[in-house]
């Protein structure tokens, strides 16, 4: 008895559920499936519906403006070929296009290294070119004792040697002629002023003064001239 009572209760509940299901379901099964799909689509893409509504509003506004311009008599450009396109922004493409890090790594970095290498070369060459004259000017000629002694003896003999004498000294000492010229110039600048200042006032004589020794030398060199000058006036015949 208990089993029959339980079976009757199960059948009655199933029938009641079937009646409720028939009341809430539509008559056309395809419409029910379509509504379910649209509901799911609305839940997944709500922004698409918003974009469509905005697009419809713009189209309505455009149509009203066209009607208003036609009523007012304002000429309009042909709208053929003018279509409004709505595209979603490409975030990844835009970020990659305007990303400075990507551009610097792909394009600018190798170019910067090449420019730096090319710029370093002329700078180094310019530094060498600038350093070369200074290095040349700092070089000093080192003379041996024999060369120095020989040059000093030649300076004592003639402080102002000409080109021929300098070439002769250069051939003997194996020193270039320009170096010999510089050596004599430096030697004159150092020693000749000292020699002039070391003389005593008695030894200094004006250039126009002539001593007895110089007069005797002149007399020895030109005896005829001095004999003509020293002839007394009494030796000449007196006119009558």
From Swiss-Prot:
Region Disordered: start-end pairs: 193-240
Q: Does the keyword RNA-binding apply?
A: no
CDD domains found in the cross-reference section: homeodomain
Where on the tree of life does the source sit, at the highest rank?
A: Eukaryota
Record's keyword terms, sorted: Activator, Developmental protein, Differentiation, DNA-binding, Gastrulation, Homeobox, Neurogenesis, Nucleus, Transcription, Transcription regulation, Wnt signaling pathway
InterPro entries found in the cross-reference section: HD, Homeobox_regulator, Homeodomain-like_sf
Gene Ontology cellular-component terms for this entry are: nucleus; transcription regulator complex
Keyword Disulfide bond present in the record's keywords: the answer is no
Record PROSITE patterns: HOMEOBOX_2 (PS50071)
Q: What is its main location?
A: nucleus
Summarize which parts of the chain are annotated to bind DNA, as ranges: 136-195
One GO biological process term is: mesoderm formation
Q: Where is this site: Determines DNA-binding specificity?
A: 185
Q: What does this protein do?
A: Essential for Wnt/beta-catenin-mediated formation of the Spemann organizer and for induction of the organizer precursor, the Nieuwkoop center. Acts as a transcriptional activator, cooperating with TGFbeta signals to induce a program of organizer-specific gene expression and to generate an organizer with both head- and trunk-inducing activity. Activates the head organizer gene cer1 by acting synergistically with otx2 and mix-A/mix.1 through the 5'-TAATCT-3' element of the cer1 promoter. Also binds as a complex with lhx1/lim1 and mix-A/mix.1 to the 3x 5'-TAAT-3' element of the cer1 promoter.
Stated name of the protein? Homeobox protein siamois
The source organism is Xenopus tropicalis
Gene this protein is translated from: siamois
């Amino acid at each position: 008895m208990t089993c029959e009572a339980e079976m009757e209760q199960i059948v009655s509940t199933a029938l009641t559920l079937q009646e409720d299901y028939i009341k809430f379901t539509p008559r056309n099964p395809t419409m029910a499936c379509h509504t379910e799909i649209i509901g799911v689509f609305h839940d997944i893409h709500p922004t698409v519906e918003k974009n469509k509504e905005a697009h419809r509003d713009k189209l309505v506004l455009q149509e009203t403006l066209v009607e208003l311009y036609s009523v007012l008599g304002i000429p309009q450009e042909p709208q053929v070929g003018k279509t409004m396109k709505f595209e979603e922004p490409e975030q990844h493409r835009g970020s990659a296009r305007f990303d400075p890090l990507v551009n610097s790594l792909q394009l600018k970095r190798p170019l910067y290294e090449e420019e730096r290498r090319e710029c370093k070369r002329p700078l180094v060459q310019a530094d060498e070119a600038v350093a070369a004259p200074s290095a040349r000017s700092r070089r000093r000629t080192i003379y041996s004792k024999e060369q120095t002694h020989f040059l000093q003896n030649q300076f004592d003999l003639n402080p102002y040697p000409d080109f021929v004498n300098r070439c002769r000294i250069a051939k003997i000492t194996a020193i270039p002629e320009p170096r010999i010229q510089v050596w004599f110039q430096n030697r004159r600048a150092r020693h000749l002023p000292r020699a002039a200042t070391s003389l005593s006032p008695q030894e200094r004589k004006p250039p126009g003064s002539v001593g007895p020794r110089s007069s005797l030398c002149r007399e020895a060199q030109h005896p005829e001239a001095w004999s003509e000058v020293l002839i007394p006036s009494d030796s000449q015949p007196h006119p009558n």
